[in-house]
Swiss-Prot record:
Glycan-linked positions: N27, N28, N40, N104, N304, N498
Intervals, Extracellular compartment: 18-529
Positions of transmembrane segments: 530-550
Designated name of the protein: Hemagglutinin
InterPro entries for this protein: Capsid_hemagglutn, Hemagglutn_HA1_a/b_dom_sf, Hemagglutn_influenz_A, Hemagglutn_influenz_A/B
Length: 566
């Protein structure tokens, strides 16, 4: 019996065995990502793909300053409104800035035909050469070129007119038919602007041009149009009952344009040889211009970012991220960040990849924790970690490269009569924007799911690598841990980690320890059976004694009559 009790004591006294665990890195990161199946998954590492900040400044673009139109708009600048004289010397820019209160446009009232299309053309121009297409001094010898001035375009209190146009009127009582041609030899497109004057009365027509039935004809290989003045009474605008309509065309290299008129011509004086590029644009912004430089400009401010997406503004100029409506686009690069609960013991829940990661392992994503007589410690598996880092880095770079189509996105121009087209265009643009946003978000969700699954797969592979080496020299105890059936010193532990574990060397010791443990289990079962029998007999005796005592007490006080028959 003493031997049995000794075996039972041994069964409840377990010596601490050598142990090795497979696990993964955890840290104090609070980064969260979304996946297809989950939201706000905390991860150890992640990269942001969405730029949401700007510097609040209008800057030079790649070292080239923008053209700030100030109180002028594009029309006032190109026509040469006297209030825009400071812009006459501008010949190159990175982009063009209008403000919300750019009031100086056409000074003489009238309509600028196809003005929105002209703005679109100028959006792709980064510089031009302003030159006299028809010199004022000798191009119109039979007509007056100095009397065409008006109070509508006054400057510093004196009558004036556009700096790039000539208002040609009769000389004396004669306005002979004029004809003037220009052949483009600039080697690039030339922007030519002219106008047609529409007087309010026939007397004004005669006093200015003499000819009652005047016309203006403009023709090139691509443009051909004849204009006749529309004489009619109109309400005064800026003190003028007359109107001027403004026209423009682009003349190709080698092409010739001819102006013919018997009156009412607002002739071109200066024209513009255009240098086109893809990086310019026109933006409307009240943001101040600063002495700074950027690669991407929005009306709100400059973006200095290499990220593939931004949600600052849909209008951009330069090498800019794609605008999306998203508020968060974060891609996971690390693992699920689930630090283990330290109070649960070294080889409880904290030890494995099932319930939590290790904050103590800081030099890799996956690795080992061991404990033996020589101590305990963490060690990262550098090979699997490096392979994972390379794979995920390549994936992130590939995603950024594919989605990082940087370009200029400027607003399209529509006049007041094209509201339906403008509204339709906005709907189309919104549709494309929704598609871009959906694609970006879906891409990130899918890649995050794949990345986290990839990490889980790598940890599982590391676990299977250890398991296949140890075989029956150790047993699985959960949470990614193995308990050795033999003593495993630091050299032994290192061999498990680097894949050189010598199974035959430890198999005999492991076999003996397994058999001893199994024997203890069998002896323990015998003890448990003996104790169960003793416990049953003792319980029965106690029950019988209790019943006898109760019966004796009841007989003694008359509650129970006892008759003994012989």
């Amino acid at each position: 019996m003493e031997a049995k009790l000794f075996v039972l004591f041994c069964a409840f006294t377990t010596l601490e065995a050598d142990t090795i665990c497979v696990g993964y890195h955890a840290n104090n990161s609070t980064d969260t990502v979304d996946t297809i199946l989950e939201k706000n998954v905390t991860v150890t590492h992640s990269v942001n793909l969405l730029e949401n900040s700007h510097n609040g400044k209008l800057c030079s673009l790649n070292g080239v300053a923008p053209l700030q139109l100030g109180k002028c708009n594009v029309a006032g600048w190109i026509l040469g409104n006297p209030e825009c004289d400071l812009l006459l010397t501008a010949n190159s820019w990175s982009y063009i800035i209008e403000t919300s209160d750019s009031e100086n446009g056409t000074c003489y009232p009238g309509e600028f035909i196809d003005y929105e299309e002209l703005r679109e053309q100028l959006s792709s121009v980064s510089s031009f050469e302003r030159f006299e297409i028809f010199p004022k001094a000798n191009s119109w010898p039979n007509h007056e070129t100095t009397k065409g001035i008006t109070a509508a375009c006054s400057y510093s209190g004196t009558l004036s007119f556009y700096r790039n146009l000539l208002w040609i009127v009769k000389r004396g009582n004669s306005y002979p038919k004029l004809s003037k041609s220009y052949t483009n030899n600039k080697g690039k497109e030339v922007l030519i602007i002219w106008g047609v004057h529409h007087p309010p009365t026939t007397s004004d027509q005669q006093s200015l041009y003499q000819n009652a039935d005047a016309y203006v004809s403009v023709g090139s290989s691509k443009y051909n149009r004849r204009f006749t003045p529309e004489i009619a009474a109109r309400p005064k605008v800026k003190g003028q009952a007359g109107r001027m309509n403004y026209y423009w065309t682009l003349l190709d290299q080698g092409d010739t344009i001819t102006f013919e008129a018997t009156g009412n011509l607002i002739a071109p004086w200066y024209a513009f040889a255009l240098n086109k590029g893809s990086g310019s644009g026109i933006i409307t912004s009240d943001t101040p211009v600063h002495n700074c430089d950027t690669k991407c400009q929005t009306p709100h401010g400059a973006l200095n970012s290499s990220l593939p997406f931004q949600n600052v503004h849909p209008i951009t100029i330069g090498e800019c991220p794609k605008y999306v409506k998203s508020t968060k686009l974060r891609m996971a690069t690390g693992l699920r960040n689930v630090p283990s609960i330290q109070s649960r013991g070294l080889f409880g829940a904290i030890a494995g990849f099932i319930e939590g990661g290790w904050t103590g392992m800081i030099d890799g994503w996956y690795g080992y924790h061991h404990q033996n007589e020589q101590g305990s410690g963490y060690a990262a598996d550098q090979k699997s970690t490096q392979i994972a880092i390379d794979g995920i880095s390549n994936k992130v770079n590939s995603v950024i490269e594919k989605m990082n189509t940087q370009f200029t996105a400027v607003g399209k121009e529509f006049n007041d009569l094209e509201k339906r087209i403008e509204n339709l265009n906005k709907k189309v643009d919104d549709g494309f924007l929704d598609v871009w946003t959906y694609n970006a978000e879906l891409l990130v969700l899918l890649e995050n799911e794949r990345t986290l699954d990839f990490h889980d797969f790598n940890v599982r592979n590391l676990y299977e690598k250890v398991k296949s080496q140890l075989r029956n020299n150790a047993k699985e105890i959960g949470n990614g841990c193995f308990e050795f059936y033999h003593k495993c010193d630091d050299e032994c532990m290192e061999s498990v980690k680097n894949g050189t574990y010598n199974y035959p060397k430890y198999s005999e010791e492991s076999k003996l320890n397994r058999e001893e443990i199994d024997g203890v289990k069998l002896e323990s079962m015998e003890v448990y059976q003996i104790l169960a029998i003793y416990s049953t007999v003792a319980s029965s005796l106690v029950l019988l004694v209790s019943l006898g005592a109760i019966s004796f007490w009841m007989c003694s006080n008359g509650s129970l009559q006892c008759r003994i028959c012989i």
